[in-house]
């Protein structure tokens, strides 16, 4: 008895879905397309939020860098800036 009722309910549900699809196939297609777009947007969001290998390496370097290394790096940057400024001064003096 219960099996017959379940089969009847299932067949009625299938008929309702088939009727909806047959009456409004464009709506079903649009809903599927919208769902696909949402899925793709979610995947894209996850991809863009994932840190790149380069970013991870930079973070790892920052963590492992000692204060002495930071001072040395800052000194090298300053020396580079001074050298560039000297070159500009020499060029202006030549003119």
Swiss-Prot record:
GO biological process, one term: response to abscisic acid
Gene Ontology CC terms: cytosol
Inducing factors: Triggered by gibberellic acid (GA) but repressed by salicylic acid (SA) and abscisic acid (ABA). Suppressed by a high concentration of calcium Ca(2+) and of other metal ions, including magnesium, cadmium, manganese, nickel and zinc. Repressed by glucose, mannitol and sorbitol, as well as by sucrose depletion. Up-regulated by cold treatment (e.g. transfert from 22 to 4 degrees Celsius). Down-regulated by flagellin peptide flg22.
Biased segments, Basic and acidic residues type: 55-80
Stretches the record annotates as 6 X 5 AA approximate repeats of V-E-E-K-K: 30-94
Native source species: Arabidopsis thaliana (Mouse-ear cress)
Gene: CCaP3
Predominant localisation class: cytoplasm
Entry's localization field: Cytoplasm, Cytosol
Ranges for the Sequence repeats: 30-35, 39-43, 54-59, 67-71, 75-79, 90-94
Tissues in which the UniProt entry reports expression: Low levels in roots (e.g. in cambium) and barely expressed in stems, shoots, flowers, siliques and leaves.
Protein name listed in UniProt: Cytosolic calcium-binding protein 3
Residue segments, region Disordered: 54-95
Keywords from the named record: Abscisic acid signaling pathway, Calcium, Cytoplasm, Repeat
Functional description taken from the UniProt entry: Binds calcium Ca(2+) and may act as a signal mediator to buffer Ca(2+).
């Amino acid at each position: 008895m219960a099996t017959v009722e379940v089969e009847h309910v299932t067949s009625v549900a299938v008929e309702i879905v088939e009727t909806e699809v047959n009456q409004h196939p464009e709506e079903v297609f649009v809903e599927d397309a919208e769902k696909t777009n949402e899925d793709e947007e979610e995947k894209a969001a996850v991809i863009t939020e994932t840190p790149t290998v380069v970013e991870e390496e930079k973070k790892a370097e920052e963590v492992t860098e000692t204060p002495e290394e930071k001072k040395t790096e800052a000194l090298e940057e300053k020396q580079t800036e001074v050298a560039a400024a000297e070159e500009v001064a020499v060029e202006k003096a030549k003119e």
